Amino acid sequence: MRIPLDSPFSPGSDTVPTVWAGRTSQLSDWRDVLRPRRLAGIHERGRTILGEAGSGKSSLVRRIAREASEAGGWATSQLRIPSGADPIKRVASALLELAAAADLPAAREQQIGDLLRRVEAVAASGISLSMRAQEGPEPYTALTDLLIEIGREALRHRDVMVVLHIDEVQNITDERARSQLLIALGDALTHDEIITAPGGARVGRALPIAVYLTGLPEFADMAGAKAGATFARRFKTTTLDAIDDDDLMTALQLFITEGWPVANDAGGVDRVFMEPDAQRAIVDLARGEPFLFQLAGERAWYAGTENLITADQVRTGWKDAALEAETHVQRILDRLPPREHQFIEAMAELAPEERSLTNIAQKLGYAKTTDAGPTAQRLDLSRRIIQRGRPYRFQHRAVEAYLTSNWPR
């Protein structure tokens, strides 16, 4: 039998769900590009992964950090930056924890001991420390220096990656703090460590350090407004799309073919299966959204105790989840600036084949079609809510369903 304790679905914020769906290109980027290249001493930019609420950006990077730790690497916890908090203090504290994990030889090397004390001062005072008149380098440079030392220690261990994950970066609204943090991290990523190669030649190499920033789409504008090309050169930005239905179906396929293993009271293992119709029903309700996929799966699991999840149980469970799903989509719409919100609503009122920029602009009452162009561009490139083309279409299928049908009811 199945009980809530055994549910493999996790709709909770920032968890790494056991039933994993999609995001293969981002995982491949870590496994096949970023990690091997940094371990080989080849420079790779940091990664910025943005997306609307529920797109799974934080869960994705938490999974990457977990993989790094399981491979023997040193990874920070998820460093969430609350609104109004000092990111310099938060990152300084995390780097001190990494230094302890790396067992930096502070006791026998005065330089490292002095560096740790510098970072401790930053962890205590944060951005305010750099606002005081003082001699010497800016205090935030201590973060760069300590991250470089941790990277050097990882290099000595071989095949050890250092991973930092800074979350909710859109909350770093103080331009000075944001600039200092991005420069501190970027300088460590671009640092050339001089080593002696076979044959005696002195060459520079990158340290095995990876930095992931996650947050809402507006961070791209916030970082680019002041840092501009410097930020782009040091961080590669990806905005997450909805997950393809095929990937969601694949994630549930084990329930169909082999059953999901759960422990039984006798100390053995039972299997929980799923009807193909139930599989399709969960995918249809999710509309490509990781959060909604986990929510639909969880409620279907809770809707019965038998070892078979049925389509009726999916529908029964969803009745309790519909309000939460509606609130989730409404929250995304409420965050949009008025001009973008109006564009989305006008587009939704048109038949799918009539969704052209000209028709949308006319519906909005614009004098010229080009007046709607910048808004369409932002909704496509920055938010991934629509996709421009002939005709325009919705990429965020939950938003489309909410505005054009009785979903999620």
Predicted regions: what they are:
Residues 1-45, 196-199, 204, 409:
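A short, basic N-terminal segment
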Residues 42-179, 207-209, 370:
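P-loop NTPase nucleotide-binding core
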Residues 157-158, 163, 171-227:
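Sensor-1/coupling segment of RecA-like P-loop NTPase cores
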Residues 224-242:
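A short helix-turn-beta junction within AAA+ P-loop NTPase domains corresponding to the substrate/partner-engaging
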Residues 240-278, 285, 296:
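Conserved small helical "lid"/interfacial subdomain of P-loop NTPases
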Residues 284, 288, 294-369:
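Winged-helix-like regulatory helical subdomains adjacent to P-loop NTPase cores
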Residues 364-382, 389:
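Short amphipathic alpha-helical interaction segments
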Residues 399-409:
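Short, amphipathic alpha-helical interaction segments positioned at domain boundaries
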